[in-house]
């Protein structure tokens, strides 16, 4: 069996097994979570005393505050924006971070608290969930990590822990149209996690994302300014990009509003763009001409098929499968009318791509002018 096929078969088997488990969890509802919580005795980080769980707090007359929040993946591009926004709105934010020699001090500097845990070691998770009302899961595998271990197995463990600890709301970030492209391992895992959440017994909110504006700086804006070659595609795929700060704003709106509970919503920017249009916008704002090398979609398909034959390249094949979808001419966009109503927001509150890139180029060009054009553009990001 080829590596990718083996990967999918294993995932289907695991999903079937875990779905059977969570079906029983879902039918018994919150009562099952309470029973599981009583079985999970969490040792406090100081003094060795048994720490009360979220359910224990509620039954003892000290209900968990609605403003208590755990952010998973808090050091990532999106996670840190969620932390910052939540703190600004008065939430008591706890961040789950990986054990490391140099912890994320900036999170504590902002006013959040941190707790160390390893997503791949479920036994380390429960202490992070004590006294928490809402979990926002912004974690995802890094390029060097095993996506299956982080984006599927760890997600199952995290959701099981949250349900057992009596978490009231679980917010999960998914990918737009993941249900339509399950041939792509990452999108298949995102869809499977969505289904897993539905039977967890918790209130949930799934936010499907189209694309972030932030990567466009390194991918297109900087190469245009530095007159470096960049890669494009000859397809008509369009993406409605969002600033991660706006995603954070929408996330907190979803947490506040009961109307967003137990819903799957797609978050999209005001307008969708093709790669060619993004490059043209960077050229216009940067006052330079881009050196573009287009990659034919056919080459992506061939490369993906070729890499399947090698065990060491299965991860590369997975990424190429995702790239193939991105270059297939589909539209990652959504009508946000009903979503804005649900969130109590309006389109005027969302940054457009033109505004975002214009702010970047105005700052970088001003800085370059001040230093005589000798600095490297890549040192300056919004």
Predicted regions and their residues:
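Hydrophobic beta-strand segment of the Class I
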Residues: 135
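Oxidoreductase cofactor-interface core, primarily capturing Rossmann-like NAD(P)-dependent enzymes
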Residues: 47-109, 120-132, 142-148, 161-169, ...
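A hydrophobic C-terminal alpha-helical subdomain
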Residues: 47, 298-382
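Cofactor-binding loops of NAD(P)H-dependent oxidoreductases
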Residues: 117
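N-terminal chloroplast transit peptides
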Residues: 1-34, 44
């Amino acid at each position: 069996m080829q590596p990718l096929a083996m990967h999918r078969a294993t995932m289907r088997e695991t999903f079937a097994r875990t779905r059977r488990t969570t079906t029983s969890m879902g039918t018994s509802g919150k009562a099952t979570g309470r029973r599981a919580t009583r079985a999970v005795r969490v040792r406090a980080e100081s003094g060795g005393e048994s720490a009360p769980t979220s359910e224990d707090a509620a039954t003892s007359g000290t209900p968990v505050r609605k403003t208590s929040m755990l952010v998973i993946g808090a050091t990532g591009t999106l996670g840190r924006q969620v932390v910052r926004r939540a703190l600004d709105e008065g939430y008591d934010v706890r961040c789950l971070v990986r054990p490391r020699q140099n912890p994320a001090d900036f999170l504590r500097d902002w006013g959040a608290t941190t707790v160390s845990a390893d997503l791949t070691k479920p036994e380390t998770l429960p202490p992070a969930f004590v006294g928490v009302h809402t979990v926002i899961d912004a974690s995802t595998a890094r390029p060097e990590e095993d996506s299956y271990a982080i984006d599927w197995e760890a997600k199952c463990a995290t959701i099981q822990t949250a349900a057992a600890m009596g978490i009231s709301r679980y917010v999960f970030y998914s990918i737009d149209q993941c249900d339509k492209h399950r041939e792509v391992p990452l999108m298949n895992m995102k869809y499977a996690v969505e289904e897993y959440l539905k039977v967890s017994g918790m209130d949930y909110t799934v936010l499907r994302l189209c694309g972030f504006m932030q990567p466009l700086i390194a991918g297109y804006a900087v190469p245009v300014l530095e007159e470096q070659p960049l890669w494009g595609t000859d397809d008509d795929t369009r993406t409605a990009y969002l600033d991660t700060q706006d995603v954070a704003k929408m996330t907190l709106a979803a947490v506040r509003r009961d109307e967003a509970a137990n819903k799957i919503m797609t978050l999209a920017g005001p307008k969708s763009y093709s790669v060619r249009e993004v490059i043209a916008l960077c050229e216009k704002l940067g006052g330079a001409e881009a050196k573009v090398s287009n990659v034919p979609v056919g080459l992506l398909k061939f490369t993906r098929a070729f890499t399947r034959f090698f065990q060491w390249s299965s991860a590369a094949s997975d990424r190429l499968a995702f790239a193939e979808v991105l270059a297939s001419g589909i539209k990652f966009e959504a009508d946000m009318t009903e979503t804005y109503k649900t969130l109590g927001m309006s389109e005027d509150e969302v940054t457009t791509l033109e505004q975002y890139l214009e702010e970047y180029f105005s700052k970088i060009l001003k800085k370059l002018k001040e230093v005589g054009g000798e600095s490297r553009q890549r040192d300056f990001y919004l």
